[in-house]
Amino acid sequence: MPCLHSYRSAVEQAGGTVLEVQYCDAQPDRAAAAMEAVMQKYPQGVDALLVTSDDMALAAIKCIWDNNSAAYQKTVICGFDGNQAAVEALDRGELTVDIAQQGYEMGYKAVEAALDALEGKSVESVIDSGSEVITADNIDAYIADCREKGLWS
């Protein structure tokens, strides 16, 4: 898994240690169960959680809050997708950072590529739709952009 390899490399280069990886198949209920297990195994807390989907990150956050876990209140939690519920959690201070995978751009560029292919034009084998790191510093601009594109109400 390229994402896992790059994650491990970045953590190690920063002087950190990956304690473990929990595979949850993008299922929030499995993420909640995994979070329960992590909290039992590491009752003192962990520094950070990298969760590969926003729905799973929100399930982990709910688990922390439901268990009133003081040891995990300061854990840096990173989600992926940039969906509205996760960005709202970031705005409330529950999620620390979110990586938006730019679904709008993915869809737009996919249609452009399909139209080019239908017209007999060459299409790049890799089309980068970008990603955006969302934090408390740029959340307002991200929300405004989503609303401007009609993605959020």
Regions found by a protein language model. Give the residues of each.
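Short beta-strand elements at the ligand-binding edges of bilobed clamshell
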Residues: 21, 92-104
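Glycine- and acidic-residue-enriched helix-capping/strand-helix junction motifs
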Residues: 1-3
